[in-house]
Amino acid sequence: MITRRYIFPGVIELNVQARRRLGVNIYLIDGGTEYALIDVGFLDELSDVLELIRQMDFSLSACKMILATHADADHTQGLARAREVLKCKVAAHPKSVAPLEEGDEVLTYARIDAQNIHIPMPRCKVDRTIDEGDVLTIGDKTLEVWSTPGHTAGQLSFRMGPLLFSGDNIFRDGCVGVIDAHHGSNLVDFIASLRRIRDCDATYLLPSHGPIFRKDNALIEATIARLESYTHMADFGTCAVDWPLLDQWEDELAAGKLDLG
């Protein structure tokens, strides 16, 4: 057996526990008599994840549920197998149900043809849908479900006291989860979710990638400003709200103006 490395009371992060980087952050919420997992990562890492849980002297049968922050493959490719082994329920946002149950390779980012990325995405039954305002009890721990769309339509965060398990909303360097219209991203929703995180009284953000960090409103505000600029840039295609250049050009056309510098 190995010593459990609690970062906060009742919270173990498996990258920190293993002292090595996995494909995604996996949080174990220890409620005493039972526990839950937030995300499970890639299928080829699942055996290591389960072995690590065993080595920490947690019974596999004590897992109450797996919470999917969203349906992306790096968070959920191992979900079906984990559900089978742990014999627990899988909970996800209603908009994550179809991608997970259908094994949709595009919406889960398991297939990105332009980058020659293609990994299998096993179909996984979602036993329970969870959404904004739901409260989850894991032994003596309570998590409040937040709907924080933007990166994906089904992105969830989980509040536990001063902690916010914040998914792919924002990372310690100010980066955010990938923005891609084919993936279901929405910049306006993303900005609203970041504003909510900025304005909340959580002390720490526990993201799905990279280190846990103290909530920094200046960092979040800078990220919001950057994303707001994206809403007016052609670079972001249909994720953008408008493209001011074309409005300017329309005015120039109407005025018969040809400005060649």
Please identify what each model-predicted range represents.
Residues 42-46, 54-135, 225, 232:
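Active-site HxH/HxHxD metal-binding segment of metal-dependent hydrolases
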Residues 29, 39, 49, 70, ...:
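Divalent metal-coordination and catalytic microenvironments
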Residues 2-56, 157-167:
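Conserved beta-strand hairpin/beta-sheet module of binuclear metal-dependent hydrolase folds
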Residues 236-261:
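C-terminal regulatory/interaction regions
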Residues 35, 42-44, 135, 142-149, ...:
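Metallo-beta-lactamase
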